[in-house]
């Protein structure tokens, strides 16, 4: 009987050690995944900012073109409204 009890306790200890190792590996992989998500988010943000900064000049050009369609600006002519 004590022989079976010793085997049972040893099996529980081995199972506990295996569970600790498995959950440690899962935790390490989870931290890697979270870190990669943060990197991807920063990369996406930087890429969007780069696209935005390139498009600002195009937006300004469109605004200037829209203002240019109003007619010529004559500083001395007050009734140009």
Curated annotation (Swiss-Prot):
The modification Phosphoserine is found at residues 53, 57. Keywords: AIDS, Apoptosis, Host membrane, Host-virus interaction, Inhibition of host innate immune response by virus, Inhibition of host tetherin by virus, Ion channel, Ion transport, Membrane, Phosphoprotein, Transmembrane, Transmembrane helix, Transport, Viral immunoevasion. The keyword Membrane applies. Its main location: host cell. Residues 29-81 are cytoplasmic. One of its GO terms (cellular component) is membrane. The chain crosses the membrane at residues 8-28. SUPFAM superfamilies: HIV-1 VPU cytoplasmic domain. Phosphorylated by host CK2. This phosphorylation is necessary for interaction with human BTRC and degradation of CD4. It is found in: Host membrane. GO terms for molecular function: CD4 receptor binding; monoatomic cation channel activity. Ion channel activity is inhibited by hexamethylene amiloride in vitro. InterPro entries: Vpu (IPR008187), Vpu_cyt_dom_sf (IPR009032). Enhances virion budding by targeting host CD4 and Tetherin/BST2 to proteasome degradation. Degradation of CD4 prevents any unwanted premature interactions between viral Env and its host receptor CD4 in the endoplasmic reticulum. Degradation of antiretroviral protein Tetherin/BST2 is important for virion budding, as BST2 tethers new viral particles to the host cell membrane. Mechanistically, Vpu bridges either CD4 or BST2 to BTRC, a substrate recognition subunit of the Skp1/Cullin/F-box protein E3 ubiquitin ligase, induces their ubiquitination and subsequent proteasomal degradation. The N-terminus and transmembrane domains are required for self-oligomerization and proper virion budding, whereas the cytoplasmic domain is required for CD4 degradation. The cytoplasmic domain is composed of 2 amphipathic alpha helix that form a U-shape. The N-terminal and transmembrane domains are required for proper virion budding, whereas the cytoplasmic domain is required for CD4 degradation. The cytoplasmic domain is composed of 2 amphipathic alpha helix. Belongs to the HIV-1 VPU protein family. This is Protein Vpu. It comes from Human immunodeficiency virus type 1 group M subtype F1 (isolate VI850). The lineage of its organism: Viruses, Riboviria, Pararnavirae, Artverviricota, Revtraviricetes. The gene is vpu.
């Amino acid at each position: 009987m004590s022989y079976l009890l010793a085997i049972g306790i040893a099996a529980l200890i081995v199972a506990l050690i295996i569970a600790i190792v498995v959950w440690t590996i899962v935790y390490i992989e989870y931290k890697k995944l979270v870190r990669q998500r943060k990197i991807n988010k920063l990369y996406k943000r930087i890429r969007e900012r780069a696209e935005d900064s390139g498009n600002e000049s195009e937006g300004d050009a469109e605004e200037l073109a829209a203002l240019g369609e109003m007619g010529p600006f004559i500083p001395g002519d007050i009734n140009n409204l």
